[in-house]
Regions:
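Short, conserved loop-to-beta-strand elements that form functional interface hotspots
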Residues: 95-98, 285
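Glycine-rich phosphate-binding loop of actin/hexokinase-like ATP-binding domains
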Residues: 110-167
């Protein structure tokens, strides 16, 4: 009888507001992919749904997994780890904030710099030369998440309604957004949108970009303000760990809004460099980077690596 070999593999999940990305480590064992997300703010019986997600992805089961999840606090992390085995998850699972995986993907694990994320939500994190970490923003779509897909579309809707009421400049956005959200008339736009999930609102970002491409000044103003807000997040995070802004800082950025929209990405780079007073070392993160970082952290955590264990169990951003 031939020998049986046990392949040690680790799984990383990056669960944002719009989708879940998963990757394996070591790379090449199995392909990564995208699944429907779960979210603490909107999903009832979160542990059962997360278990279903893990078990649906993890075939065969990994040696361990790290789940990076938006909107999870310390209580939720502890509760999920305790409840997952009762739903059939037999391998060790650690829960971290999605900002932790993004910071690791951006190299803040061991080097100073900034990471800015803009997807359905937004945030910025920074690491100083002394290892101090800070997070700014990412406090939820109702009161934070400036420069995110949701925020940009929300502000476009506000501008469209102001134009309708005669309180703002006329804009193509009024008709374009009314059609995009299947509202019967522009006056009903606000009521229709309020019934939707944040990711459904953020998904209409192409409408804003379409208006911008047609030289709509209101759309341009909304986008410019969003780039400025993201820059402010990055500056605030950096000041928390470095005291002041200066050129030559390493800045990584990612999330669906920045990854897939060149006009926003290029505008952010220009705004950041102007605000920091010179050239920055700008790095675009792929859509899989945070999930890949989570998978690597799972490996180190499971094997008892001190630095990885610190990030998984004690770093909070």
């Amino acid at each position: 009888m031939g020998a049986t070999f046990w392949i040690v593999t680790y799984l990383g999940l990056d669960i944002g507001g719009s989708k879940c990305r998963y990757e394996w480590w070591p790379t090449g064992f199995a392909g990564g992919g995208v699944a429907e997300p779960v979210h603490p703010a909107v999903d009832v019986d979160l542990a059962a749904k997360l278990a279903d997600l893990l078990l649906g992805i993890a075939t065969p089961a990994p040696s361990a997994a790290v789940v990076a999840m938006a909107g999870v606090d310390a209580h939720a992390k502890a509760a999920l780890r305790e409840q997952l085995p009762g739903h059939g998850v037999t391998f060790p699972v650690a829960i971290v904030e999605d900002t932790v995986a993004a910071a690791a993907a951006a190299g803040l694990y061991d080097e100073p710099g900034i990471v800015i994320g803009s997807g359905t939500g937004s945030f910025a994190s920074a690491r100083g030369a002394d290892g101090q970490l800070a997070r700014v923003g990412g406090r939820g779509y109702a009161f934070s998440d400036e420069g995110s897909g949701y925020d940009l579309v929300r502000k476009a809707i506000v501008a469209a309604l102001h134009a309708l009421d005669g309180r703002g400049r006329e804009t193509l956005l009024t008709d374009l957004l009314t059609d995009a959200f299947d509202a019967r008339e522009p006056q009903r736009l606000g009521g229709v949108v309020q019934r939707l999930r944040p990711r459904e609102v953020a998904g209409r970002l192409p409408v804003l970009l379409d208006a911008y491409a047609r030289d709509d000044w209101v759309a341009a103003d909304v986008l410019q303000n969003g780039m400025y807000q993201l820059t402010q997040l990055g500056m605030a995070a950096w000041k928390k760990v470095a005291g002041s802004v200066q050129p030559d800082v390493r800045v990584a950025y990612g999330g669906g809004v920045l990854e897939h929209n060149e006009v926003i990405r290029d505008g952010l780079e220009r705004t950041m460099q102007a605000s920091f007073g010179g050239q920055l070392l700008m790095l675009s993160l792929s859509s899989s980077a945070a999930a890949e970082a989570a998978a690597r952290l799972a490996g180190g955590w499971h094997q008892g690596d001190e630095a990885d264990t610190e990030w998984v169990e004690r770093v909070s951003l």
